[in-house]
């Protein structure tokens, strides 16, 4: 992409040298691959008036006397068919270089010479192509009367002493607004801290008489227009704007050398016709591509009396002849513009031959739209189309500016306005980011004042609401890349210059204690000391595994783009994964083992956070298994691990029996499981697994486990333990009772308040009402 510094200077006052400006652009905005120096390209080239024209017999040449602003006329031989007396033309004097050859290996320097052996010719009257302004060699360039006088330098009249930057497009992939001079200049203003002179048309739409416009659902249209627009999917085309104009001679080129022609040439484009030149010029200016249809052909293709425009995906096998004559076979991701469902354009890429503007065109349908960049990237690669328009669309042109650019095109073309339709089903709200001054300075390592931050952002179009140190940053419609705090912080750092940030280490305090990390470390050490092994399993599991464990599939989040059919759900418990690992371990020649895992789980009942992201809980899952054990129950085996671990954490717990109707504990056997309580708070579940679960996983009978909520455990830990300087007294206490375990434990704890009490066994003979409960008691002597 080529960017003219002179064009930038029309919108920004530049207080630095060109060299410094180019350096700033390169360091803060975009990679500059090269600079084309045109400061002397148009030296010794003047505006002149042709005073006398005489045809040279038997040739196509004319002998011309021209006024170059001096006392005497200068003679030039000219072969252009459009040379005539009284016209203002462009003269390249002897000794000057023809501009189109300036950058060639052998530039063409003019002199004074004899034509046909006797007619002296001093320099030449130049055509637009020879001036390097494009176009065909069909005559000499003509200057509009009143805009210059004989003797004026061409470079002064058209501001041609310029530096043209060659930009690396890839470094602007995320900035579609910078693919237009206005957006690029706005960024330059922000970098320099200067006011940006924004064109009024970006904010002021077409003016209509009162009641002329009608507002519908997601659309605006003029009363006198019968244009219909249907967009099949707003994600394919968030906005589609059309205007209908009657133009007397659409192919008429501007006979005078113009700023539009010169700017198109600087960007590497050629002049084609009045309408097309305006659309191309506005694309270079704003970054918004436009397209012009022959309206009468549009109706003829659709076989209707009114325009019925549909924006839709291509159907299998659809073909379309493009403006360049190539017939493309559409792919399913191509977006098509259709007239009564007949394709007339490959959206964002190129128009169709069947609606091409030509010398017969009387009515023009102008299009300004926003299309899905993802679809257009596929279109670009599939069909090998790399036009200026699709280059911009594939960067993500904002839907916010289509209508205003269309309105400016209507004004520039200056035809008879016949109607409009603006459809915007996918026009979203501006991005809003809440941030504080301290957050900005903390991440950048700076001490920027609030006022400087606000001014910097406002200079490039952001709206800022200030509440003390808090800033509400509202992104302008053209900044489709702003979503999070870091995006805003990056803008400030870039615009003010990363090179201006002092390389000083931040005076941050060391990271605070991570209590969860410390808790996990202690649990890991404790369980490993007791012979358990830590495992790490996938956070994603299958529906089959959920059902095998008896869990409610509806309470798990399903992953839309899962990496495998076996990994479609985010787990809501660690136990199913541990049961699966237990099966794998039981196949090995080991008599007994215990495994555990600490990780995050997600359940729909946990809800969403403020950003709409599922809330998670950190859990500890544990399973103990033995091939053969006749001396104790699996429940109490698991309970020993749990209580030894909790003892090291300084947590006392109670147990409440699980009722069979409680759905949260479907995988546990109700008669052999209990809820783990820390005071009034439930922190987990412990128990033996149901036969149905064991059978599903093909596991041995001696199997139990627990799962505790580490977030809840963290609130109850007490690492401070009294140091004992004496031996501890150990004894067993057996109580025969009809009461349940929880009631008996409460009575024992009341009798031995300072002791560490661990249940040992519970025995109840068949047919007996009483049971024997044995506790292991340790007290200080």
Task: Name the predicted role of every residue range.
Residues 47-76, 261-262, 273, 279-354:
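Conserved mixed alpha/beta core segments that line enzyme active sites in large multi-domain catalysts
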Residues 5, 55-57, 197-208, 218-318:
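Glycine/proline-enriched, intrinsically flexible loops and inter-domain linkers
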Residues 1-210, 218-221, 365, 384, ...:
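Phosphate-backbone binding interfaces of nucleic-acid-interacting proteins
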Residues 121-129, 139-141, 159-163, 305, ...:
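Mobile "lid/hinge" segments at catalytic clefts and subdomain interfaces of large enzymes
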Residues 433-593, 778-781:
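Extended, well-folded interaction surfaces typified by the phenylalanyl-tRNA synthetase beta subunit core
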Residues 192-208, 221-231, 416-440:
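Terminal amphipathic helices with adjacent charged low-complexity linkers/tails
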Residues 39-43, 203, 282, 510-515, ...:
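Beta-rich nucleic-acid/ligand-interaction surfaces
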Residues 2, 23, 27, 459-462, ...:
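A carboxyl-terminal module marker
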């Amino acid at each position: 992409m080529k960017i003219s510094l002179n064009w930038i200077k029309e919108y920004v006052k530049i207080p630095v040298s060109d060299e410094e400006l180019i350096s700033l652009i390169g360091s803060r905005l975009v990679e500059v691959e090269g600079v084309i120096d045109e400061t002397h390209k148009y030296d010794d080239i003047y505006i002149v008036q042709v005073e006398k024209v005489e045809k040279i017999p038997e040739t196509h040449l004319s002998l011309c006397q021209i006024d170059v602003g001096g006392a005497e006329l200068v003679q030039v031989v000219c072969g252009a068919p459009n040379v005539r007396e009284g016209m203002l033309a462009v003269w390249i004097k002897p000794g000057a270089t023809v501009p189109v050859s300036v950058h060639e290996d052998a530039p063409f320097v003019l002199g004074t010479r004899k034509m046909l052996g006797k007619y002296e010719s001093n320099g030449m009257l130049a055509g637009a192509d020879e001036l390097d302004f494009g176009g065909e060699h069909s005559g000499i360039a003509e200057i509009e009367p009143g805009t210059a006088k004989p003797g004026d330098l061409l470079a002064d009249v058209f501001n041609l002493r310029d530096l043209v930057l060659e930009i690396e497009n890839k470094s602007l992939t995320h900035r579609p607004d910078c693919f237009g001079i206005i957006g690029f200049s706005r960024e330059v203003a922000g970098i320099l801290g200067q006011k940006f002179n924004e064109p009024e048309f970006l904010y002021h739409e077409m003016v209509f008489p009162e009641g002329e416009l009608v507002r519908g659902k997601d659309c605006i249209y003029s009363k006198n227009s019968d244009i219909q627009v249907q967009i099949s999917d707003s994600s394919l085309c968030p906005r589609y704007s059309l205007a209908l104009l009657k133009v007397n001679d659409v192919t008429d080129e501007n006979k005078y050398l113009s700023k539009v022609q010169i700017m198109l040439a600087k960007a590497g484009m050629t002049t084609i016709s009045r309408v097309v030149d305006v659309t191309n010029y506005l694309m270079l200016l704003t970054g918004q591509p436009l397209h012009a249809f022959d309206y009468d052909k549009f109706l003829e293709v659709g076989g209707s009396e009114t325009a019925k425009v549909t924006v839709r995906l291509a159907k299998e096998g659809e073909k379309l002849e493009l403006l360049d004559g190539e017939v493309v076979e559409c792919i399913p991701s191509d977006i098509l513009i259709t007239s009564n469902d007949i394709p007339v354009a490959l959206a964002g890429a190129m128009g169709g031959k069947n609606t091409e503007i030509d010398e017969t065109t009387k009515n023009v349908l102008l299009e300004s739209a926003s299309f899905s960049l993802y679809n257009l990237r596929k279109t670009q690669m599939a069909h090998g189309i790399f036009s200026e328009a699709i280059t911009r669309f594939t960067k993500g042109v904002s839907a916010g500016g289509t209508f205003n650019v269309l309105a400016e095109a209507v004004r520039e073309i200056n035809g008879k306005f016949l109607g409009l339709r603006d459809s915007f089903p996918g026009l979203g709200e501006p991005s809003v980011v809440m941030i504080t001054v301290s957050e900005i300075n903390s991440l950048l390592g700076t001490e920027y004042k609030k006022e400087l931050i606000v001014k910097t952002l406002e200079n490039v179009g952001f709206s800022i609401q200030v509440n003390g140190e808090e800033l509400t940053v509202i992104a302008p419609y053209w900044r489709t890349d702003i979503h999070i705090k870091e995006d805003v912080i990056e803008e400030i750092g870039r615009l003010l210059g990363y090179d201006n940030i002092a390389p000083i280490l931040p005076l941050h305090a060391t990271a605070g204690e991570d209590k969860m990390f410390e808790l996990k470390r202690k649990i890991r050490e404790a369980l490993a000391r007791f012979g358990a092994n830590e495992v790490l399993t996938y956070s994603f599991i299958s529906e089959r595994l959920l059902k095998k464990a008896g869990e409610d599939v509806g309470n798990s989040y399903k992953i839309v783009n899962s990496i495998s059919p076996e990994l479609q759900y985010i787990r809501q418990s660690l136990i199913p994964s541990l049961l699966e690992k237990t099966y794998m371990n039981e196949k090995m020649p080991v008599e007994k083992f215990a495994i555990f895992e600490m990780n995050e789980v997600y359940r729909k009942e946990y809800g969403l956070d403020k950003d709409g992201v599922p809330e998670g809980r950190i859990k500890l899952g544990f399973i103990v298994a033995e091939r053969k054990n006749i001396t104790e129950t699996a429940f109490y085996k698991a309970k020993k691990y749990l209580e030894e671990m909790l003892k090291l954490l300084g947590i006392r717990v109670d147990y409440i029996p699980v009722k069979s109707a409680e759905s949260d504990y479907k995988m546990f056997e109700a008669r052999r499981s209990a809820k783990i309580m820390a005071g009034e708070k439930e922190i987990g579940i412990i128990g033996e697994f149901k036969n149905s679960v064991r059978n599903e996983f093909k596991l041995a009978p001696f199997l139990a486990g627990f799962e505790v909520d580490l977030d809840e455990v963290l609130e109850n830990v007490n690492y401070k333990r009294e140091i004992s300087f004496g031996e501890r007294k150990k004894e067993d206490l057996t109580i025969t009772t009809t009461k349940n375990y929880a009631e008996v434990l409460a009575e024992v704890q009341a009798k031995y308040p300072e002791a560490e009490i661990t249940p040992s066994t519970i025995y109840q003979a068949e047919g007996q009402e009483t049971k024997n409960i044995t506790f292991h008691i340790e007290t200080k002597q």
